[in-house]
Amino acid sequence: MSEKYTLSLEPRAVVGKKVKRLRRSGILPATVYGKGIEPISVQVDARSFNAVYRRAGRTALVELHIAGRQPLAAFIHALQRHPVTRDIIHADFRAVDLSQEVEVAVPLHIEGESPLVESGEAVLNQVLNAIEIRALPSNIPAHLTVDISGLDAFDKSIHVRDLALPPGVTLATPGDELVVSLAHARAAEEEAPAAEETTAEPELVRERREPRAEEEEE
């Protein structure tokens, strides 16, 4: 049985620039939306949110308890981060109907070892890190596994259609899209200097300020 996650939220009246005060007091502003419901501005204890997000990610259901409302089943759908500290400064929850299929992005986890990669003859070229699937909310897996142990020749590759799906899950990403392939190690090494040259320029240091999206929140 999958772990159950819950969060207690409160309706939020503070919007715009004033939300900075909430963040300084350890409160994370958030929005709940979904099919058939009006967007709800809410706030949640930042530590509680971070603890749940670390375990649930964006593919596990979270039961939201909002004062004065019935509990809602939702996914953590989108995050806004501070451009310098990378702290989460806003979250979007996507409320769902448990009886209706949804389309979500699920991360791909590489498993096993290609004999050619293990011998040093090849390097792995991973094109996709996640794919879109359709399923009932309760059937959405935390991730999908990509077994590369069968990649024992350079002409072999793995496409989306080759991935094993749990019962009740179908593909939304086209099946002919490439997931992983092999490249000759020597060719990859020869290309590396050119790639390094393109990233040798130092990044410009921009003025530190809060993002416009934060200032115009809501």
Curated annotation (Swiss-Prot):
Gene3D superfamilies: Ribosomal protein L25, beta domain (2.170.120.20), Ribosomal Protein L25, Chain P (2.40.240.10). It comes from the Bacteria. Residues 190-200 have a biased composition (Acidic residues). CDD domains: Ribosomal_L25_TL5_CTC. One of its GO terms (cellular component) is cytosolic large ribosomal subunit. Part of the 50S ribosomal subunit; part of the 5S rRNA/L5/L18/L25 subcomplex. Contacts the 5S rRNA. Binds to the 5S rRNA independently of L5 and L18. This is Large ribosomal subunit protein bL25.
